[in-house]
């Protein structure tokens, strides 16, 4: 990503109230993008590069660690590097196959990572599966979801099969927002839409519908 793109990206993100993050792939990039980013993302392939993680952590900005291909020891080492600099990273469970086979997604590792790292844990998606994302959020409580977006299906990486198109991810976001509404408050009480129907229940005295007071009202 050319550095001269960042001022415009930063301004647009500010207008849309979106945080801007970026993945540095060389050490100098950490400082080059410092004034523009709200967080740094360490890609799975750079998770073993201590110097890069330490350079990002020294800025005190938020850090997201993607953990594709990594074992627990490698993940904890990266987390410890951040912690030593006073940063609590966000950890993303990930499968670094493009696209990720459903058989290898292993979403239950989100719980494992959360318990072992004591970090917020999310999911970095390469599956392009609505089911995977919904399960990551609502069964395994993923705190963050990362995905690859191709605007028109013409990008260089689209042919590998791990990128979402705008209409696809729009549907996922719609489902997530609806699910939040569907889950509700958890309080068991009559909903607003049920209030009128309550009048038509069987009366506790004679078992007939509607309630006696409703019968009296309707004659």
Where are these regions (language model features)?
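Catalytic cores and adjacent flexible loops of soluble metabolic enzymes
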Residues: 1-219
